[in-house]
């Protein structure tokens, strides 16, 4: 009797049968790692994630600046600031919805390239904004582009990457998003808010230029009957000195079995609905850990706590820690496995959120030298209560706890949820299902980001962090019960697993 996917004894979380002896295709796959073209194609695509990460945290230095603006057309009230921070996620949800159509209609590569249009237009609107409506529209357009790339880029990368490095390459979308956020934090120390928007145009233009010379996904080309073009694309990605026919036949056989789009009736079949459910719940839990409101209001959160360093510097430090952590995840994902990193990630985030919530509840009020804004006050420039004196190095707790949270998120639930989404979704439903996951993810992010400031004003800043800590505990249980280990398996092997008659891991 075969063992179930989860619950097997042993520390390695192996969820697949033992591998057969290396085939010619497995041996040839090693040679593909020496071909740099697949890395170039990945880099060209994930520049879209750089722009996404840059746009996501654009409000962190801009909201405090506009709060202090003397221009009545650009001065933000507390309510307007919450809309400016959260409307990005509404645009991202719309982008995820459009990806359900564009991913399979235009293909992965052209969909990524199409995202450059709303992204460039959004940055231009914010750079030349003369009123709130231009800021909101620009933010929505950059959000739309971010939602579209969030659904398309992981699929494209997973479909062009060899199994041996798919974990590392699958982490690059998150890595580039983090690098984009760090770039925004660093430039925010040097540039005024309008020039920050101008600088956001650069990665968009470079992405368009590089992707023009990259091939489309061989799996997408095969699904459209363009076999010769698919073979040329695979040979280009793997290198001319590698025999790609074994891998091509495996992909072709899988595509042939799924020559039509999945119907709603078929979507209820276990081998289709289970991986979609896992991917969807992972995306929801990822957002419910609090990552989006924390990043969007990062500088304002530091403004509202007793921090020893200037909030702008704190935000930049957190961005650097996030980048380093994602880099570590990218290097270890194919060694440690997905599940181990997810467990570690959720445990670290739980400890960080709980620590930050307890500090805010019992700790000192914000320090006057560094506090230019207060999340709990009606106006971020005026605090409702007198400020306490510094409490020494205790005031480093918000920075250290936030760094710990970002580190935990970046080594697991940040990059791995995107990677697993692209790995477990069946090919026939991959385009639509990835768009559905992104749509649900960003609708959740909008609700959290829009409600964050009202909840803080009504109940206190500690309440959201206690909620986020509870969600991290749920994530630990979900990882143990429902998430499969996909390390070292091809997309065809993963999909074949869900088609077997074994006991379901969804109990």
UniProtKB/Swiss-Prot annotation:
The entry's note on the tissues where this protein occurs is:
Highly expressed in brain, spleen and peripheral blood leukocytes.
* Intervals of motif Dileucine internalization motif: 5-6
Which InterPro entries has this protein been placed in?
MFS_dom, MFS_sugar_transport-like, MFS_trans_sf, MFS_Trehalose_Transporter, Sugar/inositol_transpt, Sugar_transporter_CS
Q: Which residues are glycosylated?
A: 370
Tell me the keywords, alphabetical order: Glycoprotein, Lysosome, Membrane, Phosphoprotein, Sugar transport, Transmembrane, Transmembrane helix, Transport
The UniProt induction remark is:
By lipopolysaccharide (LPS).
Localization in the cell? Lysosome membrane
* CC annotations in GO: lysosomal membrane; membrane; plasma membrane
Is ATP-binding set as a keyword in this record?
no
Q: Where does the chain bind a D-hexose?
A: 174, 286-287, 418
Name the GO terms of the biological process aspect: D-glucose transmembrane transport; dehydroascorbic acid transport; fructose transmembrane transport; hexose transmembrane transport; regulation of glycolytic process; transmembrane transport
Which positions, given as ranges, span the membrane? 38-58, 82-102, 112-132, 141-161, 169-189, 195-215, 290-310, 315-335, 340-360, 396-416, 436-456, 463-483
Q: Which residues lie on this side of the membrane: Cytoplasmic?
A: 1-37, 103-111, 162-168, 216-289, 336-339, 417-435, 484-507
Database matches in PROSITE patterns: MFS (PS50850), SUGAR_TRANSPORT_1 (PS00216), SUGAR_TRANSPORT_2 (PS00217)
Please name every pair of cysteines joined by a disulfide bond in this record: none
Q: Pfam families from the xrefs? A: Sugar_tr (PF00083)
Task: Provide the function of this protein.
Answer: Probable sugar transporter that acts as a regulator of glycolysis in macrophages. Does not transport glucose.
Q: Which family does it belong to?
A: Belongs to the major facilitator superfamily. Sugar transporter (TC 2.A.1.1) family. Glucose transporter subfamily.
Q: What is this protein called?
A: Solute carrier family 2, facilitated glucose transporter member 6
Q: Which gene encodes it?
A: SLC2A6
């Amino acid at each position: 009797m075969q063992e179930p996917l989860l619950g097997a004894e042993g520390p390695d979380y192996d969820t697949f049968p033992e591998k057969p002896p290396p085939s010619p295709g497995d041996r040839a796959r090693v040679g593909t790692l020496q071909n740099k073209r697949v890395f170039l194609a990945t880099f060209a695509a994930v520049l879209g994630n750089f722009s996404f990460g840059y746009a996501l945290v654009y409000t962190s230095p801009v909201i405090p600046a506009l709060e202090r603006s003397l221009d009545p057309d650009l001065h933000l009230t507390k309510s307007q600031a919450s809309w400016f921070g959260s409307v990005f996620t509404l645009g991202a949800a719309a982008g995820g919805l459009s990806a359900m159509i564009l991913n399979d209609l235009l293909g992965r590569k052209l969909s990524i390239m199409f995202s450059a249009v709303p992204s460039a237009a959004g940055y231009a609107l914010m750079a030349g904004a003369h009123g709130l409506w231009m800021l909101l529209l620009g933010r929505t357009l950059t959000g739309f582009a971010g939602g579209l790339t969030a659904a398309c880029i992981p699929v494209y990368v997973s479909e062009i990457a060899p199994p041996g490095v798919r974990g590392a390459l699958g982490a690059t979308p998150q890595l580039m998003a983090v690098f984009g956020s760090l770039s925004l934090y660093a430039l925010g120390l040097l540039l005024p808010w309008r020039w920050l928007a101008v600088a956001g145009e650069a990665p968009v233009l470079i992405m368009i230029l590089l992707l023009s010379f990259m091939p489309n996904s061989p799996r997408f080309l095969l699904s459209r009957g363009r076999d010769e073009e698919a073979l040329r694309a695979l040979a280009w990605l793997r290198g001319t000195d590698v025999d790609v026919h074994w891998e091509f036949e495996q992909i072709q056989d899988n595509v042939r079995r799924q020559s039509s789009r999945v119907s709603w009736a078929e979507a209820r079949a276990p081998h289709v609905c289970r991986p979609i459910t896992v991917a969807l719940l992972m995306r929801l839990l990822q957002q419910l850990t609090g990552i989006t409101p924390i990043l969007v209001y990062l500088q304002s959160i530091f403004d509202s706590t007793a921090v020893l360093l200037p909030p702008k510097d704190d935000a930049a430090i957190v961005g650097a820690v996030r980048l380093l952590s994602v880099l570590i995840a990218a290097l270890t994902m194919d060694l440690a496995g997905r599940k181990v990193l997810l467990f570690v990630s959720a445990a670290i985030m739980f400890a960080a959120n709980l620590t930050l919530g307890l500090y805010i509840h019992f700790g000192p009020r914000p320090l006057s030298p560094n506090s230019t804004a207060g999340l709990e006050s009606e106006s971020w420039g005026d605090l409702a209560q007198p400020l306490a004196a510094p409490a020494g190095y205790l005031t480093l707790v918000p920075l250290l706890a936030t760094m710990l949270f970002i580190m935990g998120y970046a080594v697991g639930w940040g990059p791995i949820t995107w990677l697993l989404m692209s790995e477990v979704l069946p090919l026939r439903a991959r385009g639509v299902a990835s768009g559905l996951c992104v749509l649900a993810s960003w609708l959740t992010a909008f609700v959290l980001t829009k409600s964050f400031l009202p909840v803080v004003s009504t109940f206190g800043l500690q309440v959201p962090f206690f909620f986020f800590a509870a969600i991290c505990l749920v994530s630990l249980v979900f990882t143990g019960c429902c998430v499969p280990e996909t390390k070292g398996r091809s997309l065809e092997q993963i999909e074949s697993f869900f088609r077997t008659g074994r006991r379901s891991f969804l109990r």
